[in-house]
């Protein structure tokens, strides 16, 4: 099938779906080439089939392949950005990391080392989980490559800043507390987005505030809208090296039923995609999409959502790689003036301080 791939600008792209049906053949992300089929990848998509850190429903170990299967529907041109990401840069699928499902500490070390190996030549990672435990080693690797503490946006229904759970320091509910303690996050530029639902106590919020996290709740997104949400986030992050971690349960269960710890009242898939599009020009150095658990999915709803979130993250990386003056706002069909509007909202917010 390799001769039936789309090629442009020296980059080997996905299998041509006008010649080979989307449902045919083994699934790689967006039907892209495997890493061993290209000389170098600017962006590497990699799976981490690990869910030994979950506190409720298991099954996220099967998430990466579920997202890959759903990504067969993706097409090479992203009209919301006016970008063909697979033409701008070389994107490849590295398959899955081989991690120990019975030893969380060893798995974390393996993920961190594999991430460092995959980024040794300058490639950026978009990682498909797996549960949220995997974010810690990925952040460690990203901060090491950046040479400094990095900014982070954490899209999630939950805070994931517990201290321990059943005495364990490393679970899917603790990665960002550990990351702050280890000094790998820039605590002036970290925020949760989409949080909601009951907590064990107010101390959870007090601790989170003490660590430096900003919080944009799902209700904030609903009442303030995408534009103000994006403006506030951009104002907080600036141009720092940025890592984006997306727990699919940030979405309402109507949009993402296939996850281990669902919470009612989430944001929509449209809101999530539009928020990411509003980050055009930001310095994204790595990203993950985690907690997709296909056993609880219906008609690939969650897999499709996860595949599109990853696609927007890859597009953001590809768009940043293009030189010239194209770093305006995504056209977003009806949102031609998004960039200018974000600036207006940001100025208004600044005037209220």
Swiss-Prot record:
Regulation of its function: Strongly inhibited by the metal chelating reagent 1,10-phenanthroline. The inactivated enzyme is reactivated markedly by incubation with either Zn(2+) or Co(2+), and slightly by incubation with Mn(2+). Competitively inhibited by 5-aminovalerate and n-valerate. Also strongly inhibited by thiol compounds such as mercaptoacetate, 3-mercaptopropionate and 2-mercaptoethanol.
Catalytic activity: 4-guanidinobutanoate + H2O = urea + 4-aminobutanoate
GO biological process: one example: putrescine biosynthetic process from arginine, via agmatine
Enzyme class: hydrolase
Binding sites annotated in the UniProt record for Zn(2+) 1: 132, 156, 160, 247
Signal peptide: none
Keywords noted in UniProt: Hydrolase, Metal-binding, Zinc
Cofactor(s) required for function per UniProt: Zn(2+)
Subunit structure comment from the entry: Homohexamer.
Name the UniProt record assigns to this protein: Guanidinobutyrase
Species of the source: Arthrobacter sp. (strain KUJ 8602)
Gene: gbh
């Amino acid at each position: 099938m390799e001769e039936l791939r789309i090629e442009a600008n020296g980059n080997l792209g996905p299998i041509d779906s006008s010649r080979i049906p989307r449902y045919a053949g083994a699934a790689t992300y967006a039907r892209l080439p495997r890493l061993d089929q290209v000389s170098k990848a600017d962006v590497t998509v990699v799976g981490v089939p690990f869910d030994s850190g979950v506190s409720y429903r298991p099954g996220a170990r099967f998430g990466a392949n579920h997202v890959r299967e759903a990504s067969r529907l993706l097409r090479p041109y992203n009209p919301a950005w006016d970008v063909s990401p697979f033409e701008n840069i070389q994107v490849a699928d590295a398959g899955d990391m081989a991690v120990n499902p019975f030893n969380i500490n060893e798995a974390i070390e393996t993920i961190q080392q594999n991430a460092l190996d995959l980024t040794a030549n300058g490639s950026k990672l978009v990682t498909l989980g797996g549960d949220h435990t995997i974010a810690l080693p990925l952040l460690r690797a990203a901060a090491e490559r950046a040479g400094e503490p990095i900014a982070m946006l954490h899209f999630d229904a939950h805070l994931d800043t517990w201290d321990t759970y059943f005495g364990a320091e490393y679970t899917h509910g603790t990665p960002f507390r550990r990351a702050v303690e280890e000094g790998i996050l820039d605590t002036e530029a970290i925020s949760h987005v989409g949080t909601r639902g009951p907590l064990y106590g107010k101390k959870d919020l007090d601790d989170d505030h003490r660590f430096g996290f900003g919080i944009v709740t799902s209700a904030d997104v609903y009442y303030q809208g995408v534009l103000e949400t994006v403006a506030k986030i951009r104002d907080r992050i600036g141009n720092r090296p940025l890592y984006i971690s997306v727990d699919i349960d940030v979405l309402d269960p109507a949009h993402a039923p296939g996850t281990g710890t669902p919470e009612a009242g989430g944001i929509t898939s449209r809101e999530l995609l539009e928020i990411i599009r509003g980050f055009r020009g930001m310095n994204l150095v790595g990203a993950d999409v985690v907690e997709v658990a296909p056993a609880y999915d219906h008609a690939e709803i969650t897999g499709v959502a996860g595949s599109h979130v990853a696609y927007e993250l890859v597009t953001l990386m590809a768009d940043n790689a293009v030189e010239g003056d194209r770093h305006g706002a995504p056209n977003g069909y009806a949102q031609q003036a998004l960039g200018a509007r974000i600036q207006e909202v940001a100025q208004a917010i600044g005037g209220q301080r």
